[in-house]
Design a protein with these regions (language model features):
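Small-residue-enriched flexible connectors and coil-helix boundary/helix-cap motifs
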Residues: 2-176
Length: 176
């Protein structure tokens, strides 16, 4: 059977809407700019879709060359500009500690209002730090489809947050 690459995705802010790409450079730290930013709560703990499922509705973009970050909220509000680095902070993700800088400005109030609780946007000190298990996540369409049942039909593959989506593999063959 023929194996094809059917999707490439990234999200400059961890847990926000995935951005589709036609082509990308892949390095040992994953896709450039992917999950470079993340959210923390008022206690400094990482916030993901597990804490606020609605985060996937916020679109974002980051132009590294211009140091320009943009978020587009579902109501159409756009916040765009240079993310001003505030104080340094350490965050723990799946047992790994890494450093970043809190981003100052309107970003925090807008995202907090959307989530319904206080959050702060953080820029990771180094690219490629904010992955869950691996810098790249590879998923086959048939693996996702095999999880469908009478209760869960037409599962949106984006909920699995793949970096690379492949078609033409047997379910879970990408694990090997």
């Amino acid at each position: 059977h023929m194996i094809t690459l059917s999707g490439i995705f990234s999200a400059p802010i961890k847990s926000f809407a995935l951005i589709p790409h036609q082509e990308v450079y892949v390095g040992y730290k994953g896709l450039p700019g992917d999950r470079r930013f993340y959210l923390i709560d008022s206690n400094g703990k990482l916030i993901t879709q597990r804490n606020c499922t609605r985060l996937a509705l916020i679109r974002c973009g980051f132009l590294e060359s211009k140091n320009e970050l943009s978020i587009i909220l579902p109501d159409g509000r756009i916040i765009r500009g240079e993310p001003a680095l505030g104080r340094k902070i350490g965050t723990i993700l799946w047992g790994r500690r890494f450093n970043g800088h809190i981003i100052e400005g309107d970003w925090n109030d807008a995202i907090s209002e959307f989530c319904g609780f206080q959050v702060r946007l953080v820029k990771s000190e180094f690219e490629g730090n904010c992955y869950d298990e691996y810098p790249l996540s590879i998923l086959s369409k048939d693996s996702a489809k095999s999880l469908e049942s009478k209760e869960f039909q037409d599962i949106d593959i984006r909920r699995f947050r793949p970096s690379i989506l492949i078609d033409g593999l047997n379910p879970f063959e990408e694990n090997y």
